[in-house]
Amino acid sequence: MERLRRLGLLSLLAASVGCADDAAVDPFAGPVPAQCPVTSTEQSMVMTKLVLLRQSAPGISDGFNLDGRVSGADDALSCRRRDLTNPDGTAGVDNQLSLLVPALDTATAGALDAAIQGAINNGQMMLAVSIEGLDDRLNDPCVTVVFRRVQGSPFVGSDARIDPGQTFDTIREEPVSRVTGRMRNGVIEAGPFALGLPVAVLTARFVIPIQNAQLRIRWRADDTFEGLVGGGIPAAGMIAATETLVIGSDLMGLVRRLILSITDLDPDEDGNCRSFSAAVAFEGRAAFVNP
């Protein structure tokens, strides 16, 4: 009997230790899984605003540290392009596109932001983002973020933004980008991944290939969203895309030279960088997306 009682106590002790171990497991520990568990809950949004981030002051820009370095003019691995500083004081931000945006403003007679907004509002350039595999809308150790180009005839409110709650159709022949990430306190972080950012502004039609993209999305309580995407854009591809713009040859040559002057990522064998860093901010509102 005494032996049985001791065995029982040992079993209870082992069980309690096992429970304690289970309770101590941090679901956010380790790398993000390549695939998240499937759940019946997802949330979609349509981008209602998209902005190519400029420098708010010389050397100051939001964005990501894409190469894990804080580079100065003496850093050969970044082709001697100086990193920027986040508005909160964090150094190492990679957003060389911010040096090109003023030239793009010139190409559109100072109406770059308005042209992008107009293309979104008239349904010409709509991108939907879906958050799949949701277990919790504040803290979730694994969610899948899906970018799709969509089409439809959006209703626009008095605030000059697409109204929430509308339904749009996926453009099936367009590429779809997926990435797994984590959500903490309503903020999703994910990457790196490949993202094709469609541009349909004025007469321009092209896709910007963003490599090794990093993503941050804040999901607010009112089902609005704000986000930031950063990554590397191949210089050769961007030059080819800008050649579709209806601008003069002098300005085209200037844009080409500017692109080649801001490359700071993906150095080749000779140390010449083949891509430049970029950061894009966006806002979104809840929507329904037909597959």
Question: Where are the regions that the model predicts?
Answer:
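Hydrophobic helical h-region of N-terminal Sec-dependent signal peptides
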Residues: L9-L13
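Bacterial N-terminal signal peptides that target proteins for export
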Residues: M1-G8
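C-terminal motif of bacterial Sec signal peptides marking the signal peptidase cleavage site
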Residues: A15-G18
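Extracytosolic secretory-pathway proteins
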Residues: D22-P291
